[in-house]
């Protein structure tokens, strides 16, 4: 059965999304910059609402907009934000850390993996900035260390839809059932079935996936 993950930057549309079939929410703030960590009170209220609908809450852990290269100080803040969100009852986090040359920062990611044992960890769309030739090995590494899922648009906003669909198939083959593939980026109620027809892709993400 397909799973619809609603991307929310506040609580305004949450109940509408749950009533329309969303069974997981990625909660963030400031979608204008691609999402940042939401506030304590927003997380708390989202968890309360989600429980009423038996839905899951994944919280975005990102201290600012811009790139995904973080200082030690920023990483410490992100880990502390995760502890707060975890204690508020979320089901997991969405996070992504890159090096200056757009490779996955494995040392930093391992810190989040260790801090989130027993919770779900989504590698978010920072993945899409990793060079194509390095994406397969990155997926292999994520499988090995226990990342729950990969949220990806399989390209950039300019990438042709047909090419994106082909890449999703490749990602799903590489994931081999050991890493969930979550399709996102321009997916709506009207076109979501195009992505859900793909072998190995049974979940979609976005602000318009359920209404």
Regions picked out by a protein language model, each given a short descriptive name:
Residues 31-32, 64-66:
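A short, flexible beta-alpha/helix-coil linker loop
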Residues 2-8, 25-27, 57-61, 93-95, ...:
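Hydrophobic faces of well-ordered beta-strands that scaffold small-molecule active sites
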Residues 1-25, 30-37:
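N-terminal pre-domain/capping segments
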Residues 11-15, 31-56, 72-75, 97-117, ...:
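Active-site-adjacent beta->alpha loops and helix N-cap segments on the catalytic face
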Residues 9-20, 66-84, 121, 128-145, ...:
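Catalytic cores of alpha/beta
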Residues 25, 51-55, 89, 116-119, ...:
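Short helix-capping segments at alpha-helix termini
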Residues 22-35, 84-101, 145-160, 199-211:
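Glycine-rich phosphate-binding active-site loops on the catalytic face of alpha/beta enzymes
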């Amino acid at each position: 059965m397909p799973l619809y993950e609603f991307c929310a930057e506040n609580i305004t549309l949450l109940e509408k999304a749950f009533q329309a079939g969303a069974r997981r929410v990625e909660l963030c703030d400031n979608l204008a910059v691609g999402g940042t960590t939401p506030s304590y009170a927003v997380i708390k209220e989202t968890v309360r609402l989600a429980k009423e609908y038996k839905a899951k809450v994944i919280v975005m852990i990102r201290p600012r907009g811009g790139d995904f290269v973080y200082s030690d100080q920023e990483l410490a803040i992100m880990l502390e934000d995760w502890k707060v969100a975890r204690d508020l009852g979320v089901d997991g986090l969405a996070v992504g850390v890159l090096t200056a040359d757009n490779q996955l920062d494995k040392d930093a990611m391992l810190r989040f993996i260790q801090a989130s044992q027993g919770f779900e960890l989504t590698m978010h769309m920072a993945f899409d900035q990793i060079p194509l030739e390095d994406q397969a090995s990155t997926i292999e590494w994520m499988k090995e260390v226990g990342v729950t899922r990969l949220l990806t648009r399989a390209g950039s906003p300019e990438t042709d839809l047909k090419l994106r669909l082909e890449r999703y198939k490749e990602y799903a083959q590489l994931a081999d059932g050991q890493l969930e593939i979550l399709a996102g980026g321009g997916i709506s109620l009207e076109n979501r079935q195009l992505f859900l027809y793909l072998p190995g892709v049974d979940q979609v993400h976005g602000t318009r996936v359920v209404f």
